[in-house]
């Protein structure tokens, strides 16, 4: 896993995140060079736990393959049509639904919309929060065998972006992607804990993955 991340960083031109005077801005700049990525997401929140295989293609194509709950379900967002195709029992199987990304039945258990689910949107929300607050860099740590940079971004009193008042991030030192994120509301309660695993960056994904 570590060697794969190092290789991905080399191929994408990522510089070590600790070398950047502003790690969050460095991670955002690097994300702009990313054309594709795939990752396994584990999300824990008050509504339960979700495991998803997640695929992204610029400028915003998203494919989600659900591991739990709803094992086998596939959801694809197309930024050109601004529609979501949903196969509850697997891509190509009946039924296939066409839905708005605003539809409540396809939001995550934590309320996330598929068209707002990519790492770029996460980074932009955190940057907007920092502009109305502050951030603290806690330094390098080891998380699941990976070197990560631990930082916390907190809005001023009463300030929240996308319902989040505080974001605690562990940024992978090589890939500059979040390895873990904990979001909290204005009362300090945890909204969601997200772990990202098995990351691959800029390995070309076939067009048929997003248009089966």
What are these regions (language model features)?
Residues 27-33, 53-55, 64-65, 73-77, ...:
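Short linear motifs in intrinsically disordered
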Residues 24-28, 119-123, 168:
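Extracytoplasmic/secreted envelope proteins and their assembly/folding machinery
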